[in-house]
Amino acid sequence: ILLDVTTGTGAFMKTVDQSIELAKLMVSIGTHHGRRVAAMITDMDTPLGHNIGNSLEVMESMDVLKGHGPADLTEVCLQLAANMLVLADKGTPAECRAMAEAAIADGSAFAKCKEMFAAQGGDTRVLDDYSLFEQPAASFELLAEQDGYIVANDAEKIGSASVLLGAGRQKKGDPLDFAAGITLHKKRGDYVKKGESLATFYGAADKFEAAAAEYRSGLGYGPEKPEEAPLVYALVTKDGVARY
């Protein structure tokens, strides 16, 4: 069992140390019950990839398996896959990383996903033709209000904005809009000019104003490019914590 324990503004645990303590507890519980368990501590200050929303994230996940997904999301997926293979005694960390990379390169990772999708009654055509997904009612471009580097792109606020668009529930029983969500064009560390598109919102037009305000509340600009944050902070196993 490999756990992905996120840390940061968009995570349940906001600091790396808190996330490590949670991971250690979960690993110890699994180990106590005879399971082979590890946990990766991954960053969630800024969203991985470019898409937030149900259908949007499925499309982006398929892009990763096809070998042309966003670099940050692909890297985390490769590290997760490699560590899962290590847990299964398939080789050394380097060998398992190479196996994961090869599965994407030769198409076997995507083929296996399609097989699993079909086994659960899914229409595999949508995995190749994204136009078959339900389409959003409307779209809206969120524009930069000034020039500068994006120094904050709060994952929690972006997640809340996507919920306001209908991609998630504000309360039990709320309907989901599977086509709703956000595509990020600029993320933390990117330079933007005033009037440039930061993100595209998808959903019902009457929800854009509130979602835009929520998104902007977690956005920060600065004159200097911020230091790049790690994608993975640590690996927690029964033998201890390896910090990266």
Regions of interest found by a model, annotated:
Residues 1-244:
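Well-ordered secondary-structure scaffolds
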